[in-house]
Amino acid sequence: MKSEVLSVKEKIGYGMGDAASHIIFDNVMLYMMFFYTDIFGIPAGFVGTMFLVARALDAISDPCMGLLADRTRSRWGKFRPWVLFGALPFGIVCVLAYSTPDLSMNGKMIYAAITYTLLTLLYTVVNIPYCALGGVITNDPTQRISLQSWRFVLATAGGMLSTVLMMPLVNLIGGDNKPLGFQGGIAVLSVVAFMMLAFCFFTTKERVEAPPTTTSMREDLRDIWQNDQWRIVGLLTIFNILAVCVRGGAMMYYVTWILGTPEVFVAFLTTYCVGNLIGSALAKPLTDWKCKVTIFWWTNALLAVISLAMFFVPMQASITMFVFIFVIGVLHQLVTPIQWVMMSDTVDYGEWCNGKRLTGISFAGTLFVLKLGLAFGGALIGWMLAYGGYDAAEKAQNSATISIIIALFTIVPAICYLLSAIIAKRYYSLTTHNLKTVMEQLAQGKRRCQQQFTSQEVQN
């Protein structure tokens, strides 16, 4: 395929798809645990276990969705139809998940389990084809960085729109009736997400074509697993999502019980999201200046240090915490576009190794491990709060619960970032130089053995 410069309209269109996903995803990650425990009245321990089971089941569906997308043939392409036609049921189920029918406790738990599981499955139907779409819009590494930078600027804006506006919408629609407010708030946001997904469908184009798949699903899964760089990115994905999931899920508890000022939650979250916007915008110029792998592991190392430092900040130092969360927002979102480009690069690497371009199943496999990280992260919050004796009805939490909330917000993310930095520096080999070699040889129809780069040092 001849490389071409993507239009700003198409970059915005592609980014709108992830903005829509983050309107729902960030909302669920930030508010759903709190919604279930404090609004719907379900025990935290059950919610943690439900998150683990539902997300694990959903993770299993990811490879199936990827294999299905890779085998899709339509006049709209392989991936775009799923983005459009999955959007409406996704929005409807999201509203149902935030509904609070008048049921017994057992009825509430069953209802929550069913609607939450459906929500995660429909997220898969839309999001796996969407993520794979980024790998077939262009195969130019520079354009991919630009596309992903636009994507995450808009994704951050979508997440910010959802998380910052959610509580004002809850208060506006429901007033003192918080269950009605949550249901109405997510309904408004779901309509916005649907329109964004439709815009994504109509403004993007699939350009990188792969020959029709003739191998079995089992062979495709085997080929993906044999891609050593895909396995590395999968591991990095687990640690990345654990960091953001645990910190995000603990944020409302942290502001409420540690900072002691729940009314500043929106301001605290907005500070983090503004940092995210800046970080997304910095990804392209920084990777133009330095190898993306170097930027990735250095940034993760810095995130680990800052997250650990937060643990020692006094509880009453609210202004200091605002500074910390802003810097973390910048740095975390700086590495996120880079990581998604690394995912696309492993698809090219896999084709270079074995002659098969498995875009759908590659992204599905990565999202599979992402969902496992989400499952464990969500469960960890619920289990740890239950272990500490968290009680939403109490006016003050015990010391064990306070310590657990602080650790979830600081220590756990620090460990995840540190492991990401070590793994990326030591094992990820698709540097700018090495990837250029892969792309040049792919253009010439050449192949190489998978181990060629494994002993090479990361080149700046």
UniProtKB/Swiss-Prot annotation:
Periplasmic face of the membrane: 1-11, 54-80, 138-152, 203-248, 310, 388-403
Coiled coil regions in record: none
An annotated GO BP: carbohydrate transport
SUPFAM superfamilies the UniProt entry points to: MFS general substrate transporter (SSF103473)
Subcellular location: Cell inner membrane
Entry keyword set: Cell inner membrane, Cell membrane, Membrane, Symport, Transmembrane, Transmembrane helix, Transport
One Pfam family named in its UniProt record: MFS_2
UniProt membrane topology term: Multi-pass membrane protein
GO cellular component: plasma membrane
Keyword Acyltransferase: no
Keyword Membrane carried by entry: yes
PANTHER family: MAJOR FACILITATOR SUPERFAMILY (MFS) PROFILE DOMAIN-CONTAINING PROTEIN, MAJOR FACILITATOR SUPERFAMILY DOMAIN-CONTAINING PROTEIN
Similarity comment text for this entry: Belongs to the sodium:galactoside symporter (TC 2.A.2) family.
Designated name of the protein: Inner membrane symporter YicJ
